[in-house]
Every structure is written in C-alpha cells, then in structure tokens.
Amino acid sequence: MEKTLATSHTKRSSPPSPSSAVNTSSTGFNRRTRQRLSDATASVSETDVEDEDEDEEGVEEKIEALQTIVPGGTELGVDALFEETASYILALQCQINAIKVLTTFLERCEKKDMKFGG
C-alpha cells in the first residue's frame, strides 16, 4: 500500500500512514480497546463504590464516637452535634485556663508560705 507523491519535478514514495497500515475493522482493534477501557472503567467504578462505602462507615463510626464523648450527644442530630461539640471544646478550653490560673496562684502562695483558713 505504498503511496506515490507526484510533483512536477520528482516522484517520491512515502511509507504508508499508521491509519492505513492497520485496518481497524479487520483486526478488531477498536473493539478490543473499547472492551479493555470498559473493563478498566468498571473496575475503577467498583473500587470507587467500595471506597465510598468504607468512607461512609468510617464517618459513621467517628460520629458515634463523638456522640459518646459530648454530653447529651446521643440525642442530637449531626448538625446539632457539631455545634454542641464546638461549644464543648470552648468550655473545656475555659476550664483549662481556669485551672492554669489557679495553679499559678497556688504556686505563688506556697512560695510566700501563706496559709489559708485561719
């Protein structure tokens, strides 16, 4: 299947183009390629679904754990649980700061040998 290019001065031969060298209808190239792509897409889709299921299970487990940690969390929906969690964290931070202040105060009192109560 060699093509000949004719010009006014010379005659040249060019190699066959890749598309003409492979007869896609007789070799079934397109059909096999489409099948492999389809199989690859199907396996990726199955993997994606499995990953999503695992992700959902992981999220549900974490929400259940959060419900047990936050006071009253078992009676709350997810949105309210997140809001309550944020409030709970702020309350815990305030308690930590109060304990730090009390600790500092008591350490100073011990250094001065101050006595309480009487």
Curated annotation (Swiss-Prot):
A single BP term in Gene Ontology: brassinosteroid mediated signaling pathway
Effect of disrupting the coding gene: Slight increase in the length of hypocotyls, cotyledons and primary leaves.
Family label: Belongs to the bHLH protein family.
Subcellular location: Nucleus
Other comments on record: Plants overexpressing PAR1 are dwarf with compact rosettes and inflorescences, epinastic leaves, shorter flowering stems and siliques and a general dark-green phenotype.
Residue spans of biased composition, Acidic residues class: 47-59
Domain bHLH: 43-92
Name the UniProt record assigns to this protein: Transcription factor PAR2
Composition skew (Polar residues), residue ranges: 19-30
Region (Disordered), start-end ranges: 1-59
